Amino acid sequence: MKTVEIPFGFFACLLVNVHAANDPDVSVLAKIAEEALTNTSINACDETNTNNSFIYCYGRLLAAVNVHNLFQDSKSFVDMPLKFDPEVIQEEFNRRFGEYELQAINRSALQAFVDENFESAGNELEDCQLEGWNEHPPKLMKIQDSMLRDWALKLNAIWKLLCRKMKPNQNPKRTSLIHIPEEFIVPGGRFREFYYWDAYWIVKGLAASGLHSTIKKMITNFVTVVDRYGFIPNGGRIYYLGRSQPPLLIPMVYEYYELTRDLAFVNKILPTLIREYEFWQNNRVINVSDDKGNTFSVFHYHSKCNVPRPESFLADIIHASRLPAHERPKFYMNIASGAESGWDFSSRWLKDGHKIETIETTDIIPIDLNAFICWNLDILQYLLRNTGNPLKSKTLRDKREILRQAMFHVFYNDTEGAWFDYNLRTKSHNFNFYPSIVVPLFGECYQPLNLARPQQIVNYLNKMGVYNYPGGVPTSLIKDTKQQWDFPNGWSPTNHMIIEGMRKSSNPVVQEQAYRLAKKWVLGNFKVFQETGHMWEKYDVNGTAPQPGSGGEYLVQDGFGWSNGVILDLLTTYHERMRIEPGDLMPNNNASATNNNGSTTGSASERMHSKSITPLIPIIISILYTYLLTR
């Protein structure tokens, strides 16, 4: 691949502010920010679980920095360590700016204050050495195709670049980081800390690389967090303490146990795993009744935070400015709940399918969350049985069966032959396509002897045309939402869950469909890596060839933890069969892809011409963006 050095200044003009020119002025934003500083606010963190929440989770300083838009990304500020104790900084802020209303604070003076009192974002972390890292892991060396094997070894080396640990002698009062004892793998880009559900696919990749001790350390970190807070937050910062993410700690432990048979470790942490399950049972359950009067207990995402998210403060108050004041607290709650889902954000959560201001996450009962919980129960009963606790194992096995039956009654539609989200407001299913409908197969939360069930799901996916895209399965078929969990983006975890859900089936036809999608996803990622030298957080699966994805509240990020993990897992799963055949790396010259409306997206040659320069733009912008944030 030929490398061309491009002067930084040449593309500097491409770096645009993420906020539009018609956004509200400072006075409007200041008024909305002041509303969130009331006594009825439920903040992301507070004095009950932190000792610096008034800096990072709420307060006039946080509001002022965002109202005056000191940073392109709100997350930059709340990731900055303190140079002094938080009480000292708060007192100095009050002395300098306490007499001014938010909009009247001088922006230059505020910037100078931040520069004097805060260090660079991410400065409390340092790189680490991966114990047992091997340049040629045995599993990867079994990959038969030489090009794919060489690529896998390059991805294996990226783990060393993503390994982080906390610097010694850190003062926890002076950082927003949640302190954990062991090293961990970060996703990459702006994501400088651990993230909950990302870690599952990172673990899958670490397993392929033979890094079992790193997996154990990451699990130990999560166990420490559950022991401290009673649950696992969205990510490793205190401003994430108001919400979780899809519950995948227990599946991570299952992966580790199957690799190592380390029963002593599993037995030691089992009480904590049960406690993590109980968080969801005690805080995220809602009852749903059918038209026959039967009531079912199911799970939904429901953060109680009713204020702007600290890491996305400016974006939240800009959206809130388009709503009446009395609707804003519920909007913030639904935004936080959408972030808890991991799908931040998607038409899946939007009342009108397009505008973020119509978000109604808490009114939606998601099929994938319930399938995750069902999977958790199956793993827990298995681990309990293996550690000599058959009675507790049976209790959880019975709970799983009750939930499996509830999932059939609440989510399954006989006509379509698939599971769908259930909307409490409309009392109906959302029949739009989302990959989440396959998670019951992934978590094996259906009757495994029913060979027709997986085939019905495959038939539905075929009917929706989601296999027709050259780069993989998109996250929805809803267009023009500008949300990252919608068309045309495809994500590693969703494609992996579709593949694994079908592969685990006993139906050989469905298993073959899994392989075809796996090869498509692998080759798409490979092409982008060949072009850019990077793995990306998400991919545009449309057009003649995939490219880095776009949309959402921030620029596309490289790295990237779960993308690397999925590829390594698929390459080792299909290590004998998957090969690059002649013509595989050529652009897709097939006829036009059909969209969900039955119309076409244009011929291959037209799409290639229109996108010839497009793949470079998000890459260049992302690099410039990261560069400026770290200056």
Report residues per predicted region.
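Cleavable N-terminal signal peptides of Sec/SRP-targeted secreted and luminal proteins
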Residues: 3-20, 615-627
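Extended glycan-interaction surfaces of carbohydrate-active proteins
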Residues: 36, 40, 45-48, 52, ...
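Alpha-helical support elements that line or immediately flank enzyme active sites
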Residues: 195-222, 436-448, 496-508
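TPR repeat positional signature
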Residues: 199, 250-253, 370, 374-377, ...
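Aromatic/His-enriched, Gly/Pro-containing loop or helix-boundary segments
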Residues: 226-269
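Inter-helical turn/loop segments and adjacent helix faces that build the functional surface
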Residues: 256-268, 380-395, 504-509
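Short amphipathic alpha-helical coiled-coil/interface segments
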Residues: 273-276, 393-408, 514, 518-522
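C-terminal GPI-anchoring signal of eukaryotic secretory precursors
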Residues: 584-617
